[in-house]
UniProtKB/Swiss-Prot annotation:
InterPro entries: Hfq, LSM_dom_sf, Sm
Gene: hfq
UniProt keyword list: RNA-binding, Stress response
Cysteine pairs bridged by disulfides in the record: none
Descriptive protein name: RNA-binding protein Hfq
Length: 79
């Protein structure tokens, strides 16, 4: 994955994790998963609800937070 992709994903997912924001994650096959982001890395997201699920990022279509989240992206690194 490109570094630019990580510049957007990491701050967004980290804000959702730190603020314990409930999310809906839509997979490319249309399935909707709900829970809180427990952790993430370059390839997977750990989603916690009644159980913890490891969701591969390549299977994720959309991440929808239950509320607005402020996250900082370093503009100086984008070009």
């Amino acid at each position: 994955m490109s570094n630019k992709g990580q510049l957007l994903q990491d701050p967004f997912l980290n804000a959702l994790r730190k603020e314990h924001v409930p999310v809906s994650i839509y997979l490319v096959n249309g399935i909707k998963l709900q829970g809180n982001i427990e952790s993430f890395d370059q390839y997977v997201v750990l989603l916690r609800n009644t159980v913890t699920q490891m969701v591969y990022k390549h299977a994720i279509s959309t991440v929808v937070p239950a509320r607005a989240v402020n996250f900082r992206v370093d503009d100086s690194a984008e070009a």
